[in-house]
């Protein structure tokens, strides 16, 4: 039974990483389509770089997101001391997502907000045995807000004159 629980945990972590990496590439592509009046059908291939800048940035953003989830996320997830490390680390990452708005051009609020929310979900799952349920809920809320603000900046960058 323990092996299944560990597998479920890892599945949630990597699902969060995949969703976050996809969003970190998707929303800038939406902004690019709106900026150049391209066809919305181009979103079907949002992972495919459209220019030389994209050839560098798309793989870089994906690799950095996976590395962040792999290092920080796994470290927080594998808390053996029953202190609900995912809740604490998730909240810190969510706050970094809010501050990351200053670095929106590398999708920092989306990446850190996604990691914070993912770790917050794991923290909420552990709250009955390890405590810190409120901190986990805050990680989810702040992480989701940072994620949403990062996405909104990309989608509405032109209207915001960014």
PLM features: what roles do these ranges have?
Residues 1-6, 35-40, 80-98:
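Hydrophobic alpha-helical transmembrane segments
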Residues 5, 68-86, 118-138:
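Cytoplasmic membrane-interface segments at the C-terminal ends of transmembrane helices
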Residues 46-51, 64-80, 99-101, 156:
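Short juxtamembrane and helix-loop transition motifs at transmembrane-helix boundaries
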Residues 88-119:
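Hydrophobic alpha-helical transmembrane segments of integral membrane proteins
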Residues 146-162:
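Juxtamembrane boundary at the C-terminal end of a transmembrane helix
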């Amino acid at each position: 039974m323990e092996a299944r629980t560990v597998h479920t945990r890892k599945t949630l972590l990597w699902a969060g990483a995949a969703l976050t990496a996809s969003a970190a590439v998707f929303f800038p592509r939406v902004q690019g389509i709106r900026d150049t009046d391209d066809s919305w059908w181009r979103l079907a291939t949002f992972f495919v770089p459209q220019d030389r800048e994209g050839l560098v940035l798309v793989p870089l953003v994906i690799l950095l997101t996976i590395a962040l989830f792999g290092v920080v996320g796994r470290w927080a997830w594998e808390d053996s001391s029953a202190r609900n490390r995912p809740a604490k680390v998730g909240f810190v990452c969510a706050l970094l997502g809010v501050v990351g708005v200053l670095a929106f051009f590398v999708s920092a609020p989306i990446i850190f907000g996604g990691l914070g929310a993912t770790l917050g979900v794991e923290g909420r799952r552990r709250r009955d045995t390890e405590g810190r349920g409120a901190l986990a809920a805050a990680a989810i809320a702040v992480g989701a807000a940072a994620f949403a603000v990062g996405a909104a900046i990309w989608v509405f960058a032109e209207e915001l004159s960014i």
